[in-house]
Regions:
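N-terminal Rossmann NAD(P)H-binding glycine-rich loop of SDR-like oxidoreductase domains
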Residues: 2-24
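Mid/C-terminal beta-alpha module of Rossmann-like enzyme folds, strongest
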Residues: 217-285, 303, 308, 317-337
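Short-chain dehydrogenase/reductase
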Residues: 90-94, 129-130, 134, 140-153, ...
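Conserved beta-loop-beta element that borders a ligand/cofactor-binding pocket
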Residues: 116, 151-177
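Glycine/proline-rich active-site loop of Rossmann-fold NAD(P)-dependent oxidoreductases
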Residues: 161-164, 176-188, 220-230, 253-255
Length: 337
């Protein structure tokens, strides 16, 4: 029997569906059973047991872990741009991970697969070799980056203290279908589709991966006799311009950028982001801290370890992933309208 925390999120929901379809007994953990917005899709699946698993409630987590063989801890607060949420994001990642692991150990769960992030790995200079699972970022000025990094480090410490069998999966920015509410990754794509970069694309890249490939990495990490960290990210990390060219080919109404934005304007990207939000209604997706962290750096992450140790492969192209994401964004927008 399996447990998925954060089961109403983009990754969590797709993981629940995949496990159920593979014939596993699935327990889906959510913050509150009394919130229809967070439970309706899970209830509609059928064959899935819903339980409350609030990260601040150790008693709920312990009850949710009872009888579980493999626990997938995917619950997190994912936010780059909302001011004043730093402590909430940090607590959910650090205290939440520790509480989940202690509950799993107490319930004698056989294995825990914890969802971390490629943001725990350092950005690199353009000519440097890619970062991998042996590396840890030291630039913690972005609250979400700090939360995921400190959360995973605490998880490894606690797992060691408790003798708990744990592996971590480090996804990139998750694309693809199967979401009801936007994440920052989805906000970025929606903003681009609405013309947020029509006047210029920054000379930056994006660490993409499809949700179906992230699910596959989690399942393989659970099934294989393995240990350590595994980066689940596409083979290449595309530039914003190449992403927009692909999106324009999917939907010609999505505008291409008029130019490559000069490097000296990169620091002003958060200002442009706020202006686009005010004038075009695009979602905000970039903070000043993240823009500063990326100055002169790129996302360059190796997925070699996941390929060699797990037998994982990128199976969904960027084009298919963007197509499915754009279709889901439009469907959600129409439903809410």
């Amino acid at each position: 029997q399996t447990l998925v925390t954060g089961a109403n999120g983009h990754l969590g929901y797709n993981l629940v569906v995949a496990l159920r379809d593979a014939g596993h007994r699935v327990r889906a953990g959510v913050r509150s059973l009394g919130d229809p917005a967070r439970t309706a899709r899970l209830k509609a699946l059928g064959g899935v047991e819903l339980v409350e698993a609030e990260l601040r409630r150790p008693d709920q987590l312990r009850a949710a872990m009872d009888g579980i063989d493999v626990a997938f801890h995917a619950a997190a607060v994912y936010d780059y741009v909302t001011p004043g949420r730093g402590q909430e994001i940090l607590d959910a990642s650090v205290r939440g991970a520790e509480a989940a692991l202690r509950a799993a150990a107490d319930a004698r769960v056989r294995k825990v697969v914890l969802t971390s992030s490629v943001v725990t790995l350092p950005f690199t200079a353009p000519d440097d070799p890619p970062s991998d699972e042996n590396d840890w970022t030291t630039d913690l000025r972005v609250p979400y980056v700090r939360a995921k990094t400190e959360g995973e480090r605490v998880a490894w410490r606690v797992a060691g203290e408790l003798g708990l069998n744990m592996v971590t999966v480090l996804p990139g920015a998750i694309l693809g279908p199967g979401f009801a509410r936007n994440t920052p990754s989805i906000d970025a794509i929606e903003a681009m589709s609405m013309g947020a970069l029509r006047f210029g694309a920054p000379d930056m890249n994006f660490p993409l991966v499809d949700v179906r490939d992230v699910v596959a990495a989690h399942v393989l990490a659970a099934e294989q006799d393995c240990e350590g960290r595994f980066a689940a990210i596409n083979d290449t990390q595309p530039t914003f311009r190449s992403m927009l060219e692909t999106m324009h080919a999917i939907d010609p109404k999505i505008p291409l950028p008029m130019m490559q934005m000069p490097g000296f304007l990169a620091r002003a990207l958060p200002l442009f982001d706020r202006l686009n939000h005010a004038m075009l209604g695009t979602p905000q997706s970039l903070s000043s801290e993240l823009a500063a962290s990326l100055q002169g750096k790129i996302w360059n992450v190796s997925n070699r370890r996941a390929k060699e140790r797990l037998g994982w492969r990128q199976s969904i192209t960027m084009e298919q992933s963007l197509r499915d994401k754009l279709e889901t964004i439009r469907a959600n927008r129409n439903r809410h309208a």
